[in-house]
A protein has these predicted regions:
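N-terminal active-site segment of His-dependent metallophosphoesterases
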Residues: 1-68, 141
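His/Asp/Glu-rich metal-coordinating catalytic cores
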Residues: 49, 58-196
Length: 196
């Protein structure tokens, strides 16, 4: 089973600190096109699941055109599931309001949920101020051969919104911790069983 992991696309970010409004609009169009190309790549490579670990959009500024562009790309690849956990820049409620969400676009909420694909279990949760401390004890125990956990936050020794306490996830039978928020690729050993 092939899985593709992405995060922090920040679609429709204003980007006007270092760019003119026209340059920012062009860059945002390129980011949407990159997402659409990624879905085509996933289709060509027979990817079964795309993990979107937060900050797909950049706050309330996201346009209807961008949301429709994302959902159209998802609809064009119905054989691929897109698992999405929102991040600190996402405004999930407004972005998807009045949109028909395709069946293959699955959103994690502020409660743990697990989706299974044969012997692979993928669990995810949106970190909020109400669950930031308790989510580590509430992580569903999975007996699958491969266990993946999706979170959006910075590696930390604390528990809070936008923070992932790596120490509290060690020894929990996690094979891959799919993170967002960090804006850089890395692959580190989490414990003897897993990487992040």
């Amino acid at each position: 089973m092939k899985i593709l992991h992405c995060a922090d696309l920040h679609m429709d970010s204003p980007m006007e600190t270092h760019m003119t409004r026209e340059q920012a609009a062009k860059r945002n169009a390129e980011i949407l096109m990159s997402f659409q190309r990624m879905t085509g790549y996933a289709e060509n490579e027979n990817v079964r699941v795309v993990l979107i670990a937060g900050d797909l959009f950049d706050g309330e500024r996201v346009t209807r055109r961008t949301v429709e562009g994302v959902l159209d790309a998802v609809r064009r690849t119905p054989q691929i599931d897109y698992l999405y956990v929102s991040g600190n820049h996402d405004d999930q409620t407004n972005a998807f309001a009045d949109q028909e969400i395709p069946e293959n676009f699955k959103r994690f909420t502020d409660k743990w949920n697990t989706i299974k694909y044969g012997d692979v279990a993928i669990s995810g949760i949106e970190i909020t101020k109400n669950n930031a401390s308790a989510l580590y004890e509430q992580l569903p125990a999975q007996k699958s051969r491969v266990n993946i956990v999706m979170l959006h936050g910075q590696i930390s020794s604390a528990c809070g919104v936008d923070q992932v306490n790596l120490n509290l996830l060690k020894g929990k039978n996690i094979n891959y911790l799919a993170l967002g928020h960090i804006h850089t690729y890395s692959c580190e050993q989490m414990d003897r069983d897993g990487i992040y």
